[in-house]
């Protein structure tokens, strides 16, 4: 997840998986949203002093909303903020790190991860939680196989057309029942994929 190291290797003619461009973009949520703002819908995000808006309604920042580290993974440093006190605590927990503020989706505790190899959809997995607004498998979320509809497939295809992916996960949350882009997981973990399928992701990746 070090794009500088990736760039150095690429300059020496070494093929890097994922490319340094993917590593730079996918490992900073603010940069990801800016890069994809004209590609897929997502809930409005404030990054730095700018509000990044995509083609979706409800662009305000009334409570509740989410504060999350730009570089966090696995659901770490993601906070649901319901009032000014919780906002203060969340910002303090960032300890000076870059973060984004995002309008909260309506369908909490539910998201989909789409596994990508070589720009192709391998499998989609639905994650749910009744205990937390975060549905990460590592945090106790339940998983099951998920079938993407045509609109969701089209969003994935637009993303990989804009940002080719060797191996990654694309995550979507749900707002009023519709999938909206959440983030790209560079060098994505595959534990939950093994729970819902017999796919050997390592073998596919090597091929």
Explain the meaning of each model-derived region.
Residues 1-47:
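Conserved N-proximal alpha/beta basic substrate-recognition cap immediately N-terminal to
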Residues 62-84:
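Conserved anion/nucleotide-ligand pocket segment
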Residues 65, 100, 122-123, 168, ...:
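Protein kinase-like catalytic core scaffold
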Residues 76-163:
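Phosphate-binding site of ATP-dependent enzymes
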Residues 161, 165, 174-207:
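C-terminal active-site "lid" helix and adjoining low-complexity regulatory extension at the edge
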């Amino acid at each position: 997840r070090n794009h500088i190291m990736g760039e150095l290797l690429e300059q020496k003619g070494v093929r890097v998986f994922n490319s340094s461009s993917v590593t730079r973009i996918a490992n900073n949520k603010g940069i990801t949203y800016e890069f994809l703002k004209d590609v897929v819908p997502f809930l409005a995000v404030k990054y730095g002093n700018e509000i990044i808006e995509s083609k979706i309604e409800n662009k305000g920042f009334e409570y509740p909303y989410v504060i999350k580290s730009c570089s966090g993974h696995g659901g770490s440093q993601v906070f649901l903020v319901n009032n000014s006190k919780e906002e203060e605590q969340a910002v303090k927990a960032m300890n000076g790190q870059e973060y984004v503020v995002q309008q909260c989706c309506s369908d909490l505790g539910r998201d989909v991860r789409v596994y990508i190899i070589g720009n192709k959809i391998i499998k989609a997995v639905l994650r749910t939680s009744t205990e937390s607004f975060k549905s990460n498998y590592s945090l106790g979320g339940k998983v099951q196989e998920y079938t993407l509809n045509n609109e969701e497939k089209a969003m994935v295809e637009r993303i990989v057309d804009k940002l080719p992916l060797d191996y990654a996960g694309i995550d979507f949350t749900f707002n009023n029942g519709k999938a909206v882009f959440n983030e790209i997981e560079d060098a994505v973990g595959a534990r939950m994929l093994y729970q819902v399928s017999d796919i050997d992701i390592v073998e596919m990746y090597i091929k």
